[in-house]
Each structure stands twice: as C-alpha cells, then as structure tokens.
Amino acid sequence: MYKRQLVNYGVGLCKYTGSRGKSGASDASAELVAYVRKVLDEADVVWQMAELGKVDAGGGGTVAMFMAERNIDTLDAGVPVLSMHAPFETVSKLDCYMTFKGMKAIYEA
C-alpha cells in the first residue's frame, strides 16, 4: 500500500481521516472496509487504499468527521487528484470512471 493515491490506479479509498486528535477523526471498521472491497471486486472496479494526509498537518478535510460524530461508520472514497486546489488540477479518466462504477456498485448492493 502506498501512502498516497496514484493516478490511473482506480478509485481511492481512505480508511481513516482526521485532525485535532480523536475529536475530529473517523476510522472505518474492518467489516465496512471488507464489505466495500468485496462489492468493488465483484463489480470489477479498480481501487486503491491510501492515506489522505498526516493528521494535524493540514489539508485532507472531508465530511467524514461529521458522519463519525453521529456514529456512522464512514469510509472516504473519491477520485485521486494531482495538485488539488491549484490553478490546474489533474485527474485520470480511468479513475473518474472507476469512481462512478464503484459508487453505482455500492448503491446497487
């Protein structure tokens, strides 16, 4: 497992995110991760696991912390982006399609 998302390696999954210690963190259960991996594999979706960033190092803020506050088991997923928030962001067509295909598979499961 790489510590970063790679372009052309499929939809990016992030098991844990956070800041401010445990108060702003989320960590998906092993059962949720296994379920999502199974659904994606059965749908022939290319996926990768990686970190979103170092805790308290800035960046990497998602809505996962708001879900975790309500005790909702949360797994971040999305398109890996190079140079996010820069004038020119770069994404892969394959990653976009695999994210679409993966989300569709999860909703249909």
Predicted regions and their residues:
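Active-site loops and adjacent core secondary-structure elements that bind or stabilize anionic groups
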Residues: 1
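Active-site-adjacent substrate-binding region
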Residues: 4-88
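His/Asp/Glu-rich mid-to-C-terminal helical/loop segments that flank catalytic regions of hydrolases
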Residues: 79-109
